[in-house]
Every structure is written in C-alpha cells, then in structure tokens.
Amino acid sequence: MIRVAINGYGRIGRSILRALYESGKRQQIQIVAINELAKPEAIIHLTQYDTTHGRFQPRVKLVDDQMLIGDDVIKILHEPDPAKLPWREMDIDIVYEATGAILDRNSCEAHILAGAKQVLISHPSSADVDGTIVYGVNQDLLRAEHTVVSNASCTTNCIVPVIDVLDKHFGVKSGAITTIHSAMNDQQVIDAYHDDLRRTRAAGQSIIPVDTKLARGIERILPHMKDKFEAISVRVPTINVTAIDLSVTLDKTVDIATVNQVLELAANGRFNGILGYTDEPLVSCDFNHDPRSSIIDGTQTRVSAGQLVKLLLWCDNEWGFANRMLDTSLAMIAAKQS
C-alpha cells in the first residue's frame, strides 16, 4: 500500500482524493494526510459537495481534525512550512504537491527533508526536477533514484499523446495550438486588481487571452519537437472542460479518414484509458468528469492540401489530470521498486 499526502487541497487536490475512490485504485493508494490552511469545516464541505463534479458518494465526516471516509482516517494539517510537516512520522511515500506555488526542486526538497520519499508536482515545474511525465507517453523514463517529478499540465497531458501518435505514423513538421480553457480561480468574478491586466476582468463576461507555456511543455516531453510548435490560450466563461484546437503540418499526405482511423486505433490500443475518440455531436459539458487525458472529436477533423491537419481535442482539465496524478504516482513507485 502506497502512503500519500496531499499538500494543497484546492481543485486538483480534492479531485485527486475523489478520483482515488472512484477509480478503483484505493486498494493500492492510501491518503494519510491533507495539508491545507483552510478551516477543517470548509475542507470537509468541499469534499462532500462540488459544483462541477457533484456530490461525493461516500459520507465524509470531521472528527478531531481528521477526515473520515468510511473506515479511512485522513489527518488534516494546517502547516504553512513544508519542512515542518510530519512526513517522516507518517511514513509518507509520495507527496502530491498541489498548492500551485511550489514548482521547483529546491522548494520540493522541503518535503524530502521532512521525511517524504518522493514528490509529484501537479503543475509544470522548473527544469531541475528529475522528470516531467505525461503518463502513457514517457513514464518509462522514471528511475528508482527520482525524488521530485512533475506531472506536467492538463493541456500537455491532453495534446502530447495525440502529437506522439501523429508523429509516429505520419511525421510532424510543425504545429500551432489554441487552447480554449475554462475559467480558473486565478481570475476575477467581477472586475478586480490582478498583475495581468486581462485577468482583472470578470471571468464570466469575456473570452480572455492568457499566457501559456504549452509549446515549451511539449518540447520537454518530446525533445525532437523543439521549436516546432507555438501556442496561445484563451479562457472562456465555463467552469470546467477544455478544448484544444491543434493544427499540424505532416510529412506524409493524408486524408480525414486515415487520420481519424489512426487516432481511433491508438485510443483503443496503446493509449486505451488515456485517449478517447468520438464521432458523436457532443459539446463541452459531455466531457465533464471524463477520466481520460484527451478525447479526439472526429467530426471536427479537417485536412487542407493533404498535409495540413486540424483537430479538436477535449479534456476535463481537472478530472482527467487528477487521474493521471494517480497513474504517475503508481509508476513512480513501480520504478523505485524495480
């Protein structure tokens, strides 16, 4: 049994906990502790009730600063300094670092000094970590000596498996990406101050361009794609599910049917459970709570002049990513034991 702790219990932290119980991986992973500065009553309430993902079916109780889920007991901590967390006494194998604020190796080492054996960051990190993993593509690079690993981003997890499939079958010369991302909690409900002037504006009233490092994230996973991609991102007034508009120029000449067939076969084969494929007339909310990293919308595939291909990809940017956090942590332990 892998003993884990969650540091930072926001959207991703709570999704990880809920995904653990829904995915069937509870027999492999035990959440021992949650470190979150919010009040315990709010922690319990937001675990039980969620506007996006609905009510959590197991009954959640608060007893003496402990979260009870059935027979499981999870200690709730409120320690702002990771170096002071009781990971050694709790025998923590992996910390899910989900604050969104601790993103480099040096900061994550505080968890290691506190006694955790490994750290998995739920965010793109600095380049000094031991590895950045997109599960399904490069988890085989994990090694026993790796202590600090990044799970990349939700959009990197969405797009990299698709690029990998296209490149292996047709060769990818270059690409351009537009991420159409749901609003996030770094935006404002009504106009208010923010360092990014566009994010001073009400999230529910505008389509808001934001900076993205997605192209650099692709390069980190697929180094041979360096300088081949550029990306932009806009936030839209929905609370969950993201679409990615991917355009790639291929080495080979293709048609729509060939591209869709290759992607559908990959979704049903090597990337089963990671990629999905649909030719139904669906909309974003139909992918809410979908555990896969990416779903290709075959109805929107387009080919121009035989080599320019446009795809539409969907992902639940919370739930799919949370499920990959679980998968990557299991792969980290497997590598450590090999």
From Swiss-Prot:
NAD(+) binds at R11, I12, N317. Substrate binds at S153, C154, T155, R199, T212, K213, R235. Keywords: Cytoplasm, NAD, Oxidoreductase, Pyridoxine biosynthesis. The keyword Cytoplasm applies. GO terms for cellular component: cytoplasm. The record marks H181 as: Activates thiol group during catalysis. It comes from the Bacteria. Coiled coil: none annotated. SUPFAM superfamilies: Glyceraldehyde-3-phosphate dehydrogenase-like, C-terminal domain, NAD(P)-binding Rossmann-fold domains. Its EC number is 1.2.1.72. It is found in: Cytoplasm. InterPro entries: E4P_DH_bac, GlycerAld/Erythrose_P_DH, GlycerAld_3-P_DH_AS, GlycerAld_3-P_DH_cat, GlycerAld_3-P_DH_NAD(P)-bd, NAD(P)-bd_dom_sf. GO terms for molecular function: erythrose-4-phosphate dehydrogenase activity; NAD binding. Pfam families: Gp_dh_C (PF02800), Gp_dh_N (PF00044). It catalyses: D-erythrose 4-phosphate + NAD(+) + H2O = 4-phospho-D-erythronate + NADH + 2 H(+). CDD domains: GAPDH_C_E4PDH, GAPDH_N_E4PDH. Its main location: cytoplasm. It is an enzyme of class 1 (oxidoreductase). PANTHER family: GLYCERALDEHYDE-3-PHOSPHATE DEHYDROGENASE 2 (PTHR43148). Homotetramer. HAMAP family: E4P_dehydrog. Belongs to the glyceraldehyde-3-phosphate dehydrogenase family. Epd subfamily. This is D-erythrose-4-phosphate dehydrogenase. It comes from Shewanella sp. (strain ANA-3).
